[in-house]
Design a protein with these regions (language model features):
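Juxtamembrane helix-loop boundary signature in multi-pass membrane transporters
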Residues: 50-98, 102, 113-116, 215-231
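Membrane-interface helix-cap regions at the ends of transmembrane helices
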Residues: 1-11, 79-89, 131-150, 221
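Helix-helix packing/entry segments at the starts of transmembrane helices
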Residues: 42-47, 114-130, 165-196
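Loop-to-transmembrane-helix transition segments
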Residues: 2-28, 92-100, 145-163
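Hydrophobic/small/kink-forming positions within alpha-helical transmembrane segments
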Residues: 19, 23-27, 49-54, 79, ...
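C-terminal-most transmembrane helix of multi-pass membrane proteins
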Residues: 186-231
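Transmembrane alpha-helical segments that form core, pore/gating elements
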Residues: 88-146
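C-terminal transmembrane-helix exit sites in multi-pass transporters
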Residues: 31, 48-70, 189-208
Length: 231
């Protein structure tokens, strides 16, 4: 019976709770995508790093430094300049997206807690499993048989999404949430570059200004954190 004492107890309930919360966040996100402009969806989505940082400060007692808060605010301003969302009417789609950001923030906070005892592989695998179970009933309600092109695209999305989550989980295990969250805004710059190179989308002054603010915020944060580590 000695071997049983050496078997690590897996926090299934915590993994399951996170998977359900994350799955419901995805459902709300897809609902908002079909009901409001994509710029508004993306803009509201960038409240997630802010909610996550607030949660990290309250729950994990992470240090509140000027550099971290400044980077978060500056990145958010940069994102708004790029997206130029319109918020004239508070519609159901916008409310759904707001709740989605809150649920995603809770999911990341649970993931941060799990990194204390669980491996990156375990966290990603259990999220995929429980989120899939959560999403399955919603998928069956509107199911249509995908063609081969759709299957390949879905496979690509699944692979890239899993890799993204894998590396994000590694980041959560290595650094405080208040440091990792501002970096999320950097994905907007990559999206803009992809749109420019692959889809011939145009640049304007607001995109350049917003991108510059995000880069300045992240570079400044990284430089200051490196200086703090050397002291």
């Amino acid at each position: 019976m000695q071997y049983k004492k050496n078997i690590k107890k897996i926090p299934i309930l915590k993994h399951g709770l996170r998977g359900i919360i994350h799955g419901l966040a995805v459902v709300l996100w897809f609902y908002s995508v079909t009901n409001i402009p994509m710029a508004d969806v993306t803009a509201i989505n960038y409240l997630t790093p802010i909610f996550t940082t607030i949660g990290a400060i309250l729950i994990f007692k992470e240090a509140i430094t000027f550099n971290r808060i400044f980077a978060l605010i500056l990145s958010f301003i940069g994102a708004m300049l790029i997206l130029k969302p319109g918020f004239e009417v508070l519609s159901n789609g916008k409310i759904a997206q707001l709740f989605s950001t809150i649920l995603f923030a809770i999911s990341y906070l649970i993931a941060k807690n799990l990194t204390k005892t669980e491996s990156t592989h375990s966290i990603v695998i259990f999220l995929t499993f429980f989120a899939t179970i959560t999403l399955l009933p919603f998928a069956l309600l509107i199911w249509t048989n995908p063609i081969m092109t759709d299957l390949l695209l879905l496979l690509g999305v699944a692979i890239l999404g899993t890799l993204g989550h894998y590396f994000m989980t590694i980041a959560l295990s290595l650094a405080p949430l208040s440091i990792t969250q501002p970096v999320i805004f950097f994905q907007l710059i990559w999206s803009t570059l992809i749109g420019l190179l692959l889809f011939e989308e145009s640049l304007d002054l607001f995109i350049l200004m917003g991108g510059a603010l995000i880069v300045i915020a992240i570079v400044r944060l990284s430089a200051n954190e490196n200086l703090s580590l050397k002291k």
